[in-house]
Amino acid sequence: MDKFQIHGNGPLKGEIRVSGAKNAALPILCAGLLTADTVSLDNVPNLQDVRTTLKLLRQMGMQAELDGARVTLNGADVNVLEAPYELVKTMRASILVLGPLVARFGEARVSLPGGCGIGARPVDQHIKGLQAMGAEITIEHGFIHARAKRLKGARVVTDMITVTGTENLLMAATLAEGETVLENAAREPEVTDLAQLLVKMGAKIEGIGTDRLVVQGVERLHGASHSVIADRIEAGTFLCAAAATLGDLVLRGVQPDILDTVLDKLREAGAKLETGADWIRLAMPQRAKAVSFRTSEYPAFPTDMQAQFMALNAVAEGTARVTETIFENRFMHVQELNRLGADIAVEGNTAVVNGVPRLSGANVMATDLRASASLVIAGLVADGETVIDRIYHLDRGYDRMEDKLSAVGAKIRRIA
Protein backbone atom coordinates (compact mmCIF):
# COMPACT_ATOMS: atom_id res chain seq x y z
CA MET A 1 0.00 0.00 0.00
CA ASP A 2 1.53 3.32 -1.08
CA LYS A 3 2.58 6.01 1.39
CA PHE A 4 3.93 9.55 1.16
CA GLN A 5 7.27 10.37 2.76
CA ILE A 6 7.59 14.12 3.35
CA HIS A 7 10.42 16.23 4.75
CA GLY A 8 9.26 19.69 5.80
CA ASN A 9 11.71 22.06 4.18
CA GLY A 10 10.44 25.55 3.62
CA PRO A 11 8.35 27.53 1.15
CA LEU A 12 6.65 26.32 -2.02
CA LYS A 13 7.71 28.53 -4.93
CA GLY A 14 6.86 28.30 -8.63
CA GLU A 15 3.88 27.41 -10.82
CA ILE A 16 1.33 24.57 -10.77
CA ARG A 17 -1.22 23.76 -13.48
CA VAL A 18 -4.54 22.78 -11.91
CA SER A 19 -6.32 19.69 -13.25
CA GLY A 20 -9.97 19.32 -14.25
CA ALA A 21 -12.49 18.93 -11.44
CA LYS A 22 -13.22 15.41 -10.24
CA ASN A 23 -16.68 16.48 -9.07
CA ALA A 24 -17.52 17.78 -12.55
CA ALA A 25 -15.83 14.99 -14.52
CA LEU A 26 -17.76 12.14 -12.85
CA PRO A 27 -21.32 13.36 -13.63
CA ILE A 28 -20.17 14.53 -17.07
CA LEU A 29 -18.85 11.03 -17.87
CA CYS A 30 -22.19 9.55 -16.76
CA ALA A 31 -24.01 12.02 -19.04
CA GLY A 32 -22.52 10.05 -21.95
CA LEU A 33 -25.20 7.43 -21.19
CA LEU A 34 -27.92 9.87 -22.31
CA THR A 35 -27.06 9.62 -26.03
CA ALA A 36 -26.09 7.06 -28.67
CA ASP A 37 -23.77 9.68 -30.21
CA THR A 38 -20.14 10.52 -29.40
CA VAL A 39 -19.27 12.82 -26.50
CA SER A 40 -15.70 14.21 -26.51
CA LEU A 41 -14.25 15.57 -23.28
CA ASP A 42 -11.06 17.52 -22.51
CA ASN A 43 -9.32 18.45 -19.24
CA VAL A 44 -10.41 15.17 -17.59
CA PRO A 45 -8.26 14.57 -14.48
CA ASN A 46 -6.14 11.41 -14.20
CA LEU A 47 -7.76 10.01 -11.04
CA GLN A 48 -8.76 6.66 -9.58
CA ASP A 49 -12.44 7.71 -9.48
CA VAL A 50 -12.32 8.63 -13.19
CA ARG A 51 -10.79 5.25 -14.05
CA THR A 52 -13.44 3.50 -11.91
CA THR A 53 -16.23 5.41 -13.71
CA LEU A 54 -14.82 4.49 -17.13
CA LYS A 55 -14.60 0.85 -16.04
CA LEU A 56 -18.25 0.97 -14.95
CA LEU A 57 -19.36 2.59 -18.23
CA ARG A 58 -17.42 0.02 -20.29
CA GLN A 59 -19.10 -2.81 -18.36
CA MET A 60 -22.43 -1.34 -19.49
CA GLY A 61 -21.35 -1.50 -23.14
CA MET A 62 -20.13 2.09 -23.51
CA GLN A 63 -17.13 2.64 -25.78
CA ALA A 64 -14.77 4.78 -23.70
CA GLU A 65 -11.28 5.81 -24.78
CA LEU A 66 -8.88 7.65 -22.49
CA ASP A 67 -5.92 9.52 -24.00
CA GLY A 68 -4.16 11.75 -21.48
CA ALA A 69 -6.73 14.34 -20.38
CA ARG A 70 -9.06 13.51 -23.30
CA VAL A 71 -11.95 11.05 -23.10
CA THR A 72 -14.15 9.94 -26.01
CA LEU A 73 -17.45 8.23 -25.17
CA ASN A 74 -19.97 6.49 -27.40
CA GLY A 75 -23.11 4.99 -25.89
CA ALA A 76 -24.64 3.38 -29.00
CA ASP A 77 -24.04 -0.17 -27.69
CA VAL A 78 -24.97 0.27 -24.02
CA ASN A 79 -26.96 -2.84 -23.05
CA VAL A 80 -26.13 -3.64 -19.41
CA LEU A 81 -28.31 -1.44 -17.20
CA GLU A 82 -26.63 -2.27 -13.90
CA ALA A 83 -23.93 -0.81 -11.64
CA PRO A 84 -22.55 -3.68 -9.52
CA TYR A 85 -21.52 -3.53 -5.87
CA GLU A 86 -17.80 -4.18 -6.60
CA LEU A 87 -17.51 -0.80 -8.34
CA VAL A 88 -20.14 1.22 -6.48
CA LYS A 89 -18.67 0.35 -3.06
CA THR A 90 -15.42 2.13 -3.95
CA MET A 91 -17.09 5.25 -5.32
CA ARG A 92 -20.39 6.81 -4.29
CA ALA A 93 -20.61 8.80 -7.54
CA SER A 94 -21.63 5.55 -9.31
CA ILE A 95 -25.18 6.49 -8.26
CA LEU A 96 -24.98 9.07 -11.09
CA VAL A 97 -25.75 6.38 -13.69
CA LEU A 98 -29.23 5.93 -12.20
CA GLY A 99 -30.91 9.00 -13.73
CA PRO A 100 -29.41 8.67 -17.24
CA LEU A 101 -30.19 4.92 -17.48
CA VAL A 102 -33.84 5.27 -16.41
CA ALA A 103 -34.31 8.30 -18.67
CA ARG A 104 -32.89 6.69 -21.82
CA PHE A 105 -33.58 2.97 -21.34
CA GLY A 106 -36.49 2.90 -18.89
CA GLU A 107 -34.66 0.75 -16.35
CA ALA A 108 -31.64 0.72 -14.02
CA ARG A 109 -30.22 -1.42 -11.20
CA VAL A 110 -27.65 0.39 -9.07
CA SER A 111 -26.04 -1.00 -5.94
CA LEU A 112 -26.36 1.17 -2.83
CA PRO A 113 -23.21 3.35 -2.67
CA GLY A 114 -19.85 3.39 -0.82
CA GLY A 115 -16.97 5.93 -1.15
CA CYS A 116 -15.39 8.02 1.64
CA GLY A 117 -16.78 7.15 5.07
CA ILE A 118 -17.74 10.71 6.02
CA GLY A 119 -21.32 10.62 7.12
CA ALA A 120 -24.64 9.27 5.91
CA ARG A 121 -25.00 11.02 2.53
CA PRO A 122 -28.32 9.28 1.82
CA VAL A 123 -29.60 8.62 -1.70
CA ASP A 124 -33.23 9.06 -0.69
CA GLN A 125 -33.43 12.46 -2.44
CA HIS A 126 -32.47 10.82 -5.76
CA ILE A 127 -35.15 8.15 -5.26
CA LYS A 128 -37.83 10.63 -4.19
CA GLY A 129 -37.16 12.81 -7.25
CA LEU A 130 -37.29 9.92 -9.72
CA GLN A 131 -40.52 8.67 -8.11
CA ALA A 132 -42.03 12.14 -8.57
CA MET A 133 -41.13 11.78 -12.27
CA GLY A 134 -43.05 8.51 -12.48
CA ALA A 135 -40.35 5.89 -11.86
CA GLU A 136 -41.27 2.74 -9.94
CA ILE A 137 -38.48 2.09 -7.46
CA THR A 138 -37.78 -0.90 -5.25
CA ILE A 139 -34.79 -1.53 -3.02
CA GLU A 140 -33.93 -5.22 -2.72
CA HIS A 141 -30.78 -7.30 -2.24
CA GLY A 142 -28.74 -4.10 -1.80
CA PHE A 143 -29.82 -2.68 -5.17
CA ILE A 144 -31.94 0.29 -6.20
CA HIS A 145 -34.12 -0.99 -9.05
CA ALA A 146 -35.87 1.74 -11.05
CA ARG A 147 -38.31 1.33 -13.96
CA ALA A 148 -40.31 3.77 -16.09
CA LYS A 149 -41.71 3.59 -19.63
CA ARG A 150 -40.84 7.27 -20.00
CA LEU A 151 -40.22 9.68 -17.17
CA LYS A 152 -42.75 12.50 -16.84
CA GLY A 153 -41.88 16.10 -15.99
CA ALA A 154 -42.63 17.06 -12.39
CA ARG A 155 -41.93 19.66 -9.73
CA VAL A 156 -39.31 18.21 -7.40
CA VAL A 157 -38.48 19.87 -4.09
CA THR A 158 -35.59 18.17 -2.30
CA ASP A 159 -35.59 18.24 1.54
CA MET A 160 -31.92 19.20 1.52
CA ILE A 161 -29.43 20.57 -0.98
CA THR A 162 -27.76 17.59 -2.66
CA VAL A 163 -25.14 17.95 -5.38
CA THR A 164 -25.29 14.41 -6.79
CA GLY A 165 -29.07 14.41 -6.32
CA THR A 166 -29.41 17.59 -8.39
CA GLU A 167 -27.12 16.14 -11.06
CA ASN A 168 -28.97 12.82 -11.25
CA LEU A 169 -32.40 14.44 -11.50
CA LEU A 170 -31.17 17.07 -13.97
CA MET A 171 -29.85 14.35 -16.31
CA ALA A 172 -33.07 12.35 -15.95
CA ALA A 173 -35.22 15.43 -16.65
CA THR A 174 -33.51 16.16 -19.99
CA LEU A 175 -35.26 13.15 -21.60
CA ALA A 176 -38.49 13.26 -19.55
CA GLU A 177 -41.81 14.13 -21.17
CA GLY A 178 -42.78 17.73 -20.41
CA GLU A 179 -41.41 20.24 -17.91
CA THR A 180 -39.43 19.40 -14.78
CA VAL A 181 -38.73 22.02 -12.12
CA LEU A 182 -35.96 21.24 -9.61
CA GLU A 183 -36.40 23.43 -6.52
CA ASN A 184 -33.67 23.78 -3.87
CA ALA A 185 -31.14 22.66 -6.51
CA ALA A 186 -27.42 22.68 -5.72
CA ARG A 187 -25.62 25.70 -7.21
CA GLU A 188 -22.09 24.28 -7.22
CA PRO A 189 -19.93 25.21 -10.26
CA GLU A 190 -19.66 21.50 -11.05
CA VAL A 191 -23.47 21.27 -11.41
CA THR A 192 -23.32 24.30 -13.72
CA ASP A 193 -20.57 22.62 -15.77
CA LEU A 194 -22.72 19.49 -16.21
CA ALA A 195 -25.72 21.64 -17.22
CA GLN A 196 -23.62 23.45 -19.82
CA LEU A 197 -22.59 20.12 -21.39
CA LEU A 198 -26.24 18.95 -21.41
CA VAL A 199 -27.26 22.14 -23.24
CA LYS A 200 -24.55 21.46 -25.84
CA MET A 201 -26.12 17.98 -26.23
CA GLY A 202 -29.52 19.56 -26.99
CA ALA A 203 -31.09 19.78 -23.53
CA LYS A 204 -33.36 22.73 -22.72
CA ILE A 205 -32.42 24.03 -19.27
CA GLU A 206 -33.16 27.42 -17.69
CA GLY A 207 -31.89 28.82 -14.38
CA ILE A 208 -28.38 27.36 -14.67
CA GLY A 209 -26.33 28.46 -11.65
CA THR A 210 -29.43 29.13 -9.53
CA ASP A 211 -31.34 26.99 -7.01
CA ARG A 212 -34.27 26.57 -9.44
CA LEU A 213 -33.63 24.59 -12.60
CA VAL A 214 -36.38 24.37 -15.23
CA VAL A 215 -35.97 21.61 -17.81
CA GLN A 216 -38.09 21.06 -20.93
CA GLY A 217 -37.65 17.40 -21.83
CA VAL A 218 -36.60 16.47 -25.38
CA GLU A 219 -36.97 13.22 -27.36
CA ARG A 220 -33.23 12.62 -27.72
CA LEU A 221 -29.85 14.18 -27.00
CA HIS A 222 -26.94 14.27 -29.45
CA GLY A 223 -23.15 14.26 -29.13
CA ALA A 224 -21.05 17.25 -28.05
CA SER A 225 -17.56 18.38 -27.08
CA HIS A 226 -16.77 19.91 -23.69
CA SER A 227 -13.79 20.89 -21.53
CA VAL A 228 -14.18 20.04 -17.83
CA ILE A 229 -14.05 22.99 -15.40
CA ALA A 230 -10.89 23.46 -13.28
CA ASP A 231 -10.80 21.77 -9.88
CA ARG A 232 -11.45 24.51 -7.31
CA ILE A 233 -10.69 22.14 -4.44
CA GLU A 234 -7.31 21.13 -5.86
CA ALA A 235 -6.58 24.83 -6.38
CA GLY A 236 -7.60 25.65 -2.81
CA THR A 237 -5.48 22.80 -1.46
CA PHE A 238 -2.32 24.09 -3.17
CA LEU A 239 -3.07 27.65 -2.01
CA CYS A 240 -3.35 26.43 1.60
CA ALA A 241 -0.05 24.56 1.21
CA ALA A 242 1.64 27.71 -0.12
CA ALA A 243 0.19 29.81 2.72
CA ALA A 244 1.25 27.31 5.40
CA THR A 245 4.83 27.11 4.06
CA LEU A 246 5.13 30.93 3.60
CA GLY A 247 5.46 30.33 -0.13
CA ASP A 248 4.94 32.24 -3.36
CA LEU A 249 2.86 30.19 -5.78
CA VAL A 250 1.12 30.76 -9.11
CA LEU A 251 -1.75 28.48 -10.17
CA ARG A 252 -2.57 28.21 -13.88
CA GLY A 253 -5.73 26.93 -15.56
CA VAL A 254 -8.03 28.04 -12.72
CA GLN A 255 -11.23 30.08 -12.41
CA PRO A 256 -10.75 32.54 -9.53
CA ASP A 257 -14.44 33.53 -9.49
CA ILE A 258 -15.54 30.08 -8.26
CA LEU A 259 -13.10 30.30 -5.32
CA ASP A 260 -14.32 33.57 -3.77
CA THR A 261 -14.92 32.37 -0.20
CA VAL A 262 -11.64 30.43 -0.09
CA LEU A 263 -9.67 33.42 -1.40
CA ASP A 264 -11.41 35.71 1.12
CA LYS A 265 -10.36 33.45 4.01
CA LEU A 266 -6.78 33.29 2.71
CA ARG A 267 -6.68 37.11 2.61
CA GLU A 268 -8.04 37.16 6.17
CA ALA A 269 -5.17 34.83 7.12
CA GLY A 270 -2.70 37.38 5.75
CA ALA A 271 -2.00 36.10 2.23
CA LYS A 272 -1.30 38.53 -0.61
CA LEU A 273 -3.37 37.49 -3.64
CA GLU A 274 -3.45 38.51 -7.29
CA THR A 275 -5.83 37.03 -9.86
CA GLY A 276 -6.29 37.03 -13.63
CA ALA A 277 -8.79 35.36 -15.95
CA ASP A 278 -7.21 31.91 -15.50
CA TRP A 279 -4.53 32.30 -12.82
CA ILE A 280 -4.07 33.03 -9.11
CA ARG A 281 -0.88 34.10 -7.35
CA LEU A 282 -0.50 33.74 -3.57
CA ALA A 283 2.41 35.12 -1.57
CA MET A 284 2.53 34.63 2.21
CA PRO A 285 4.93 37.11 3.82
CA GLN A 286 4.50 36.01 7.45
CA ARG A 287 2.92 33.38 9.68
CA ALA A 288 -0.81 33.07 9.01
CA LYS A 289 -3.44 34.47 11.35
CA ALA A 290 -6.04 31.95 12.53
CA VAL A 291 -9.35 32.17 10.62
CA SER A 292 -12.70 30.87 11.83
CA PHE A 293 -15.29 29.62 9.34
CA ARG A 294 -18.41 27.54 8.91
CA THR A 295 -18.91 25.14 6.01
CA SER A 296 -22.08 25.34 3.95
CA GLU A 297 -23.39 24.81 0.44
CA TYR A 298 -21.96 26.83 -2.46
CA PRO A 299 -21.37 29.77 -2.66
CA ALA A 300 -20.46 29.58 1.04
CA PHE A 301 -17.26 27.96 2.37
CA PRO A 302 -16.87 24.43 0.91
CA THR A 303 -16.80 21.41 3.21
CA ASP A 304 -14.16 19.95 0.88
CA MET A 305 -11.71 22.69 1.99
CA GLN A 306 -12.35 22.35 5.73
CA ALA A 307 -9.52 19.90 6.48
CA GLN A 308 -6.91 21.84 4.47
CA PHE A 309 -7.73 25.10 6.28
CA MET A 310 -7.54 23.26 9.58
CA ALA A 311 -3.94 22.30 8.73
CA LEU A 312 -3.21 25.98 7.97
CA ASN A 313 -4.89 27.05 11.22
CA ALA A 314 -2.83 24.47 13.12
CA VAL A 315 0.33 26.55 12.53
CA ALA A 316 -1.37 29.97 12.53
CA GLU A 317 -1.22 32.69 15.16
CA GLY A 318 -4.27 32.66 17.42
CA THR A 319 -7.35 30.46 17.83
CA ALA A 320 -9.89 29.46 15.19
CA ARG A 321 -13.32 27.86 15.44
CA VAL A 322 -14.19 25.57 12.53
CA THR A 323 -17.84 24.47 12.28
CA GLU A 324 -18.83 21.64 9.92
CA THR A 325 -22.50 21.77 8.87
CA ILE A 326 -22.53 19.49 5.80
CA PHE A 327 -21.24 16.10 6.98
CA GLU A 328 -21.15 14.55 10.42
CA ASN A 329 -17.97 12.55 11.11
CA ARG A 330 -15.75 14.90 9.08
CA PHE A 331 -13.14 15.60 11.76
CA MET A 332 -11.22 12.33 11.43
CA HIS A 333 -8.07 14.28 10.49
CA VAL A 334 -8.01 16.05 13.89
CA GLN A 335 -6.53 13.07 15.72
CA GLU A 336 -3.81 12.69 13.07
CA LEU A 337 -2.98 16.42 13.02
CA ASN A 338 -2.64 16.28 16.81
CA ARG A 339 -0.13 13.43 16.39
CA LEU A 340 2.01 15.95 14.48
CA GLY A 341 1.82 18.38 17.41
CA ALA A 342 -1.33 20.38 16.57
CA ASP A 343 -3.59 21.58 19.40
CA ILE A 344 -7.15 20.88 18.24
CA ALA A 345 -10.20 19.95 20.33
CA VAL A 346 -13.55 18.83 18.91
CA GLU A 347 -16.78 20.04 20.52
CA GLY A 348 -19.73 18.52 18.66
CA ASN A 349 -19.64 19.80 15.08
CA THR A 350 -17.03 22.47 15.90
CA ALA A 351 -13.26 22.11 16.16
CA VAL A 352 -11.29 24.64 18.22
CA VAL A 353 -7.81 25.07 16.76
CA ASN A 354 -5.13 26.71 18.89
CA GLY A 355 -2.28 27.58 16.54
CA VAL A 356 1.19 26.34 17.51
CA PRO A 357 4.53 27.72 16.25
CA ARG A 358 5.68 24.41 14.76
CA LEU A 359 4.68 20.82 14.08
CA SER A 360 6.97 17.80 14.24
CA GLY A 361 7.04 14.90 11.77
CA ALA A 362 5.42 11.57 12.67
CA ASN A 363 3.71 8.55 11.11
CA VAL A 364 0.06 9.35 10.37
CA MET A 365 -2.83 7.74 8.51
CA ALA A 366 -5.16 9.22 5.90
CA THR A 367 -8.82 8.49 6.67
CA ASP A 368 -10.54 10.10 3.68
CA LEU A 369 -9.77 12.16 0.58
CA ARG A 370 -9.56 15.69 2.02
CA ALA A 371 -8.15 14.51 5.37
CA SER A 372 -5.18 13.10 3.46
CA ALA A 373 -4.64 16.50 1.79
CA SER A 374 -4.58 18.21 5.21
CA LEU A 375 -1.90 15.78 6.39
CA VAL A 376 0.23 16.55 3.33
CA ILE A 377 0.03 20.29 4.14
CA ALA A 378 0.93 19.60 7.78
CA GLY A 379 3.82 17.37 6.67
CA LEU A 380 5.20 20.17 4.47
CA VAL A 381 5.55 22.48 7.49
CA ALA A 382 6.51 19.89 10.14
CA ASP A 383 10.10 19.51 11.34
CA GLY A 384 11.68 16.25 10.19
CA GLU A 385 10.01 13.34 8.42
CA THR A 386 6.28 12.67 8.09
CA VAL A 387 5.00 9.40 6.61
CA ILE A 388 1.34 9.33 5.52
CA ASP A 389 -0.21 5.88 5.14
CA ARG A 390 -3.30 4.93 3.07
CA ILE A 391 -2.83 7.60 0.41
CA TYR A 392 -5.12 5.64 -1.91
CA HIS A 393 -7.74 8.01 -0.46
CA LEU A 394 -5.76 10.94 -1.91
CA ASP A 395 -5.40 9.31 -5.33
CA ARG A 396 -9.19 9.27 -5.64
CA GLY A 397 -9.25 13.06 -5.91
CA TYR A 398 -5.80 14.46 -6.71
CA ASP A 399 -3.99 14.09 -10.03
CA ARG A 400 -0.26 13.33 -9.36
CA MET A 401 -0.12 15.53 -6.26
CA GLU A 402 3.44 14.54 -5.35
CA ASP A 403 4.74 15.47 -8.82
CA LYS A 404 3.07 18.88 -8.73
CA LEU A 405 4.38 19.62 -5.23
CA SER A 406 7.90 18.38 -6.00
CA ALA A 407 8.04 20.77 -8.96
CA VAL A 408 7.58 23.75 -6.60
CA GLY A 409 10.16 22.69 -4.04
CA ALA A 410 8.46 20.17 -1.75
CA LYS A 411 10.43 17.15 -0.55
CA ILE A 412 7.74 14.52 -1.05
CA ARG A 413 7.90 11.07 -2.55
CA ARG A 414 5.71 8.02 -2.94
CA ILE A 415 6.98 4.87 -1.25
CA ALA A 416 5.54 1.36 -1.17
Curated annotation (Swiss-Prot):
Family matches, as SUPFAM superfamilies: EPT/RTPC-like (SSF55205)
Enzyme Commission number, as recorded: 2.5.1.7
Residues with the 2-(S-cysteinyl)pyruvic acid O-phosphothioketal modification: C116
InterPro entries, sorted: Enolpyruvate_Tfrase_dom, Enolpyruvate_Tfrase_sf, MurA_subfamily, RNA3'P_cycl/enolpyr_Trfase_a/b, UDP_GlcNAc_COvinyl_MurA
Function noted in UniProt: Cell wall formation. Adds enolpyruvyl to UDP-N-acetylglucosamine.
Keyword check for rRNA-binding: no
GO cellular component: cytoplasm
Alphabetized Gene3D superfamilies for the sequence: Enolpyruvate transferase domain (3.65.10.10)
Binding site for phosphoenolpyruvate: K22, N23
Binding site for UDP-N-acetyl-alpha-D-glucosamine: R92, R121, P122, V123, D124, Q125, D304, I326
GO biological process, one term: UDP-N-acetylgalactosamine biosynthetic process
Record-stated family: Belongs to the EPSP synthase family. MurA subfamily.
Protein name as it appears in the record: UDP-N-acetylglucosamine 1-carboxyvinyltransferase
Molecular function GO terms recorded: UDP-N-acetylglucosamine 1-carboxyvinyltransferase activity
Top-rank taxon, per record: Bacteria
